[in-house]
A protein has these predicted regions:
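A charged, aromatic-enriched C-terminal amphipathic alpha-helix characteristic of glycosyltransferases
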Residues: 342-366
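Conserved donor-binding/catalytic core segment of Leloir-type glycosyltransferases
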Residues: 194-221, 234
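Nucleotide-sugar donor phosphate/pyrophosphate-binding loop at the beta->alpha transition
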Residues: 118-120, 128-150, 185
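Short hydrophobic beta-strand element within catalytic cores of glycosyltransferases
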Residues: 303-306
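Aromatic "clamp/platform" in nucleotide-sugar-dependent glycosyltransferases that forms part
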Residues: 286
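Nucleotide-activated donor-binding/catalytic signature segment of Leloir-type glycosyltransferases, i.e.
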Residues: 246-265
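Carbohydrate-associated surface elements
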Residues: 49, 160, 182
Length: 366
């Protein structure tokens, strides 16, 4: 990624959300954008301001960030017509659309096609808490298919995505490039085993949305406490479902055993320290590909319990995690958690991709 080779390449990355908001897509875009920029590629991140008040333009870690207003404010299904103008009036060599789940993606692809700018799309497959939107995924894919078929490249972060989207969109698998998420946490000292012995910490990591399944971990905790009375749960994330999670913990009489809060987006050292202090990471989302949290848990050698469907199940099939049905009863989830605490899965050595690998693969695709 030398500057001489890539000085002329101007990449516009379009994403519905970006820092200071926290989430898997936001983290992915930040990690690859900063690495591409440090190698000489001119990277601009175009995103939306869903609440108002964020700078319209700023520079973060050598990457120019541009924000356009979202309407209506505060809604996940917002429109952002300003995306069209930025694409139409810029001098971009390629437009990279990150995530296809909002109205931002078709706007960006349509605008790029109108200007005859090559565009690629990374799906970042995931679920949604809104039942109507979840049921409308099939219609969404049908409507987006012509735009996706015209893309210069389609990027999946997991084999699961290639199989699913190829089938649903009737696009040959050869059109997809597999570029997994990276994992790169700083090395931190292991937690004090003597101090924490008998006080197991269960971590559930991800944006606070219903489909992420944090409520399943909270519901299982009373049953875990029957066998491990000092167990605690850390729900690591932020989002609109926080109040409901707190109310559930209070209703079950375990509020003092449940911590809910995110680590600051840029503080990877603190994230590593909190994860290392955990005894098991539990990800019971309705739908995921390969979430960064899962890869980070694997990289730290932590026991990992995942939902058996979607890309999480793929991790279990590879021997990197144990799995359970996302709809299992609270008692069954508790049994699975206790099993991980008592007899954690022993993994074979595995080489995980880094963010440098991810950025280099994207540059090759461009």
């Amino acid at each position: 990624m030398s500057r001489a080779e890539n000085a002329a390449l101007r990449v516009l990355m379009v994403t519905p959300r970006y820092l200071p908001q926290i989430g898997g897509v936001e983290r992915h875009v930040h990690e690859v954008a900063t690495r591409l920029a440090s190698g000489g590629t001119e990277v601009t991140v175009l995103t939306t301001d869903r609440e108002g008040g964020l700078p319209a333009r700023e520079r973060l870690d050598s990457v120019e960030v541009r924000r356009v207003p979202a309407h209506p404010r505060g809604r996940d299904w917002h429109f952002a017509p300003g995306v069209v103008g930025v694409i139409a009036h810029g001098r971009w060599d390629i437009v990279h659309v990150q995530s296809y789940h909002t109205f931002v993606a078709p706007l960006a692809m349509t605008a790029a096609a109108a200007r005859r700018i090559p565009y690629v799309l990374t799906f970042h497959g995931g679920g949604h808490s809104d039942a109507l939107r979840h049921r409308g995924r099939g219609l969404q894919r049908t409507l987006l298919r012509p735009l996706l078929a015209r893309a210069a490249g389609l990027v999946a972060v997991a084999e699961f995505e290639i199989e699913e989207y190829s089938r649903e969109l009737r696009i040959p698998q050869e059109r997809f490039a597999l570029i997994p998420n990276g994992v790169e946490l700083p090395r931190v000292p292991a937690a004090n085993g003597d101090e924490d012995a008998g006080h197991p910490l269960i971590a559930s990591v991800g944006r606070l949305e219903r489909y992420k399944g944090h409520q399943r971990v909270i519901a299982a905790l009373p049953h875990v406490l029957a066998s491990a009375p000092s167990a605690r749960v850390w729900i690591a994330g932020s989002g609109p479902y926080e109040q409901q999670l707190r109310e559930l913990a209070a209703e079950l009489g375990i509020a003092e055993r449940v911590e809910i809060g995110a680590v600051a987006a840029g503080d990877r050292g603190e994230m590593a320290r909190r994860l290392v202090a955990s005894d098991v990471v539990v990800l019971l989302s309705d739908f995921e590909t390969h979430p960064i949290a899962a890869l980070e848990a694997i990289s730290l050698g932590l026991p990992l319990l995942v939902a058996s469907g979607s890309g999480l199940g793929e991790l279990a099939q590879r021997g990197l995690a144990r799995s359970i049905d996302a709809d299992a009863t609270a008692e069954r989830v508790a049994e699975a958690i206790l099993h991980e605490l008592r007899d954690p899965l022993v993994r074979s050595p595995v080489v995980l991709p880094t963010w440098d690998d991810c950025a280099a693969a994207l540059l090759d695709l461009y």
